[in-house]
Amino acid sequence: MNANPKFLSADARVDAAAVAPLPNSRKVYVTGSQPDIRVPMREITQADTPTSFGGEKNPPIYVYDTSGPYTDPDAKIDIRAGLPALRQRWIDARGDTETLAGLTSEYGRERAADPATAELRFPDLHRHPRRAKAGRNVTQMHYARQGIITPEMEFIAIRENQRRAEYLESLKASGPNGAKLAAMMGRQHAGQAFGAAAFGANEAGTNMLTEITPEFVRSEVACGRAIIPANINHPETEPMIIGRNFLVKINANIGNSAVTSSIGEEVDKMTWAIRWGGDTVMDLSTGKHIHETREWIIRNSPVPIGTVPIYQALEKVNGKAEDLTWEIFRDTLIEQAEQGVDYFTIHAGVRLQYVPLTANRMTGIVSRGGSIMAKWCLAHHKESFLYEHFEEICEIMKAYDVSFSLGDGLRPGSIYDANDEAQLGELKTLGELTQIAWKHDVQVMIEGPGHVPMQLIKENMDLQLDWCKEAPFYTLGPLTTDIAPGYDHITSGIGAAMIGWFGTAMLCYVTPKEHLGLPNKDDVKEGIITYKLAAHAADLAKGHPGAQVRDNALSKARFEFRWEDQFNLGLDPDKAREFHDETLPKDSAKVAHFCSMCGPHFCSMKITQDVREFAAQQGMSEDDALKKGMEVKAVEFVKTGSEIYHRQ
């Protein structure tokens, strides 16, 4: 199925499921130093602790929210108009950009003038593209290196902290046991951060960073250890950061192909992905109407959008890689930069000398972009135009603040090929290209594998940190085994959690359809939830400040049999509630002190609570209560004849 013009021109509507607030949640905004710095978060309301457990108040939990205005009941959502230009005033105030009279890319102008695409196009070019003024650099890295803290950096600092300090203060004020409760709920295991600066040199917990400040954000961007993907032509985006010293982020891939999916379906996938926690979205469309699909997605996306420009360039030469030219690729970069793409995957590290190294692989070259460039190199027997024109690409990137995502075109497609000479040779080249981009103050992250068994994952991370000078690592998984088609979200989730712990800044999700087909909405959600789990597990393992707050809150709710809070504090409240209700559907089961796993008589948490209640009644400690209970049972055993078994 391809795009439906009538649907897009007249009847485009947002997916109703994507705009419904999550249970017991509401959108809140934290205001920064100026009124238009309004940082969104999701507030999850909790019930009071039952009287039998002390009856204290449980204040709301605040969690990172990527859903943009879509889950705000007060927002007016019309995907035909796009989202509000959140960052426009900040961009204007810097005075270093100019508004263009219209599109400057040749292909962009052709599409705008083509009557055949009129009904497909996003309604009107309501915001003319912008570009840096002559001689100016508009990247967040450039500002950071000038010592400037931008509104984007302040926004990010507030967002990363998730109102953790306010939450702990609200616990302290909750009653006579408030201080004790705050200490309990704020407790966190010391992490092992493998040298990440935000977590201090001492893994025992001293000298740890306890709060993300705007200055810390600036310093991390300035040194290249983090990036803020925020094209000046995507003012709708809510600023976020990708770096090993911040919360681990996840990316969701969407995009049509030549045989399936429409523009409307891809917009729905985007809104669905960000509802469940996608921090960025990559549009990997390879079918018809790539330009129009991307415009609809960007104008309606509150998260950064990434692309692989070589895919569209290939479409322009009818799929013949050898016919690609620098001029076609350059025009494609400008076309997409003017639309507002925030980061480009560019496979400039695929060099002619590395291609023969893949000959003895089990699975050869599995990256689409990598195979395109390898074919071009062999056809022309020269270095790729991406490598030869890299400095010119940097000039384009810094005129729009597009970040590099330097592609791993020679990543392993099987664990057999992991960490081979081709993969590592390309990685070393990516480190060299990073230094060139940084000379231009262009932001860079590095893409990584792929398929890697667990014992080789840390080597990947260590080499990347060394050769790429701590530029953020962005990995696809890695998949830790090749035996589970249909379950590769799990095989890769294992590797993702590990490499996130070791220092990867962003994890590219894998869905159950990996290697099998184009994912639908259900697959997108499954991949997102799996990777949110992996990212959170990595944050916990690193000891990221406040990472354990949500775990502690859910564990407390579980022990107190606050079922609704258990559902709502989880990553997927809908599935948790569905599983519980399969066996205990009645409302009365939502307050029961057991579930269907153990039943009312064998619930370990209920037994623990009975011991505590007995101890309180007897005026003794829990240890003494357990000892007393054992003595009583011993007397009963002797009185009944010291028989292990009794007939009923």
Swiss-Prot record:
Keywords: 4Fe-4S, Iron, Iron-sulfur, Lyase, Metal-binding, S-adenosyl-L-methionine, Thiamine biosynthesis, Zinc
List of residues binding Zn(2+): H451, H515
Cofactor: [4Fe-4S] cluster
Residues given in the record as [4Fe-4S] cluster binding sites: C595, C598, C603
Bound cofactor: record note: Binds 1 [4Fe-4S] cluster per subunit. The cluster is coordinated with 3 cysteines and an exchangeable S-adenosyl-L-methionine.
This protein's GO CC annotations: cytosol
Pfam families xrefs: ThiC-associated, ThiC_Rad_SAM
Gene3D superfamilies per UniProt: 6.10.250.620, Radical SAM ThiC family, central domain (3.20.20.540)
Keyword S-adenosyl-L-methionine: yes
GO MF terms held by the record: 4 iron, 4 sulfur cluster binding; carbon-carbon lyase activity; zinc ion binding
Catalytic reactions of this protein: 5-amino-1-(5-phospho-beta-D-ribosyl)imidazole + S-adenosyl-L-methionine = 4-amino-2-methyl-5-(phosphooxymethyl)pyrimidine + CO + 5'-deoxyadenosine + formate + L-methionine + 3 H(+)
Subunit composition and interactions: Homodimer.
Functional note: Catalyzes the synthesis of the hydroxymethylpyrimidine phosphate (HMP-P) moiety of thiamine from aminoimidazole ribotide (AIR) in a radical S-adenosyl-L-methionine (SAM)-dependent reaction.
Xref: HAMAP family: ThiC
Homology family: Belongs to the ThiC family.
Name of the protein in question: Phosphomethylpyrimidine synthase
Organism: Burkholderia thailandensis (strain ATCC 700388 / DSM 13276 / CCUG 48851 / CIP 106301 / E264)
